[in-house]
Each structure stands twice: as C-alpha cells, then as structure tokens.
C-alpha cells in the first residue's frame, strides 16, 4: 500500500487534520474461498498448502492482513501499543491448523482503537478501510476514497466543488489525487475511476518500485528511510 500514489496522496490529506481528532478505525478483508490448492499427490498438496499450517505460515493476518494493518499505523502516524486477537476455524474443517476467521484489535496512544476482521467464510463487502474522526470519516476501497463530513464540521472550501457519491443515506466526497479540488459536481467516483491515472493495484506499484530500486539502489534506501525511519 505504501507504494500506491493514491494512498500517498491520502496520507498528506489525513495529516492536514481534515477529519479532526482521530477517534477510531476499522477494516476488513472478506472472501469466501478455501485458500486450498489441489495437487496430484498428498505430499505435493501438503507442500503447496503451507499457508494452512501454523508451523509454516503467519496465517490470514500475516499473509494478507499485514498490509491493511500497516496502512492503519501509516495513516494514524502511530505504532500500536497493544494488540489482541482471536481466531477460529468456522467453515473449512479440513485438517488445517490455521483459522479461517480472525478478528484483532490494535490499541494506539490516546485510547484510539483499530479493529480488523478477516475471513474465508463470507465475501460480503469484500475489503475496505474506515477511519473515523471528530469532523469526518474516511473510507478507502482499492484505489478510491471518500470523505463523509459531520454536520458541525468546519468548511474546507474545496469540498463544495468536489464530486460526490451517495452511500445509502450518506454523501461521500470523492478523494482522488487528480480530482479532489475545483472539480465539477457532476459525475461520481465510480465514473471517474476509469480515468484515474492511479487506478492500478497497489501490487503493480510495489513491483514497479522494486524494479526501479533494483537499478537505482540509493534512491530505494532513501525512500525506505523516509517511510520507515532509520532505527
């Protein structure tokens, strides 16, 4: 996620304090799939399904959820002080030792809590992230994002002209690196997604940066220090 230009843009937006005081955050990754691969022999099946073995795998949190968890700390600008979690095998009772459903809670300084739910048993609402502040909430889905302002939130000015989408009874202000300020009210985030220059997946940008850093080593080191620090 840190390689995605759209998320880099969102971090700058978040750091301006546009959502007010941080309250909480939550995210999910839902996909109904066994996570199991077929193989011609039992021996080969065990090898290629290493993700289901707790002795070899970091499980759903480590193999998939780690990216959303990292995004939370990145956006909040904090490291968690405590983490609690629970998991169980609800559907795929096929001998695996890794759970198919996990919930965890991260506690940050100031009493801020961030929850994360991940399951292989249901696909509803797929994956997304929510961040809640005293003035607005931020929803991130893939390469798109929306801000939902509170009625008593101060005016930022540009949001009057920004494009908007309706979600049930809420109106989200469309946030994207090339179309946030001084854009027309007509249209929607979904319509503009195809024109978004940053519409590739985070994996695409991560691989692109990897190839670049393989040739320009020093800039890669500098980027890492800028993002993660030199400790």
Give the residues covered by each predicted segment.
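A short catalytic or substrate-binding loop motif that flags glycine-/basic-rich loops and adjacent residues
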Residues: 96-99, 108
